[in-house]
Amino acid sequence: MGQKVHPHGLRVGVIKDWDAKWYANSQNFADNLIEDDKIRKFVKKRSYSAGIAKIEIERTAKRVKINIHTGKPGMIIGKGGKGIEELKSEILKMIKEKNVIINIVEVKRPETDAQLMAENVAQQLEKRISFRRAMKQTIQRAMRSGAKGVKTACSGRLGGAEIARTEQYHEGTIPLQTLRADIDYGFAEADTTYGKIGVKVWLYKGEVLPTKKVRTEEISQ
């Protein structure tokens, strides 16, 4: 059943880290969780064209730190940091804390980030580019950039067909049940004239934990 489990959720605490890093008591936990969801949805919607791969939120007693991983940092930062200040003021209206720190982290290789790959395919589908062409080109770019394996899947009324279906393409290996395998996963939706098309991307980058080696000791006489 490895096909049905989210690759990140299966590996959290093993080789993946949490996107939300904070602790709260039972009274504040639900409020913080709702705030995190609002922040993520707002930032994603506001800066969708900037190619946001991941949003990490860290909380302390009186501070909220937001790390935004993006392929186009200039679009969020703006001229002279104006974009950051506007984003900060808008987030402050949504949450209780008055001290918000926003860090922009550049994704050096967007072609090997599963979320950005999925969003790229979705944007091409919205421009009426063939789904087969979009998927195959995305796989080829990732493999040329050093990925060990890539799988893409598109679901919906592909090509305007009356009956919805799912089509998949893959290249290389994707060991979903190997916990030490660093598998990135991304999901995006394309809004087309025929309805929504879901895009999923699995990207295998290699094993994280080194293999155990038997130590050999030389016995000097």
Curated annotation (Swiss-Prot):
What keywords are assigned to this protein? Ribonucleoprotein, Ribosomal protein, RNA-binding, rRNA-binding
Matching InterPro entries: KH_dom, KH_dom-like_a/b, KH_dom_type_2, KH_sf_prok-type, Ribosomal_S3_C_sf, Ribosomal_uS3_bac-typ, Ribosomal_uS3_C, Ribosomal_uS3_CS
Superkingdom of this protein's organism? Bacteria
Whether Glycosyltransferase counts among this entry's keywords is no
A molecular function annotated in GO for this UniProt entry is:
mRNA binding
Its biological function? Binds the lower part of the 30S subunit head. Binds mRNA in the 70S ribosome, positioning it for translation.
Q: Tell me the subunit arrangement.
A: Part of the 30S ribosomal subunit. Forms a tight complex with proteins S10 and S14.
PANTHER family in the record: 30S/40S RIBOSOMAL PROTEIN S3 (PTHR11760), SMALL RIBOSOMAL SUBUNIT PROTEIN US3C (PTHR11760:SF19)
Homology family? Belongs to the universal ribosomal protein uS3 family.
Q: Can you name this protein?
A: Small ribosomal subunit protein uS3
Q: What gene, per UniProt, encodes this protein? A: rpsC
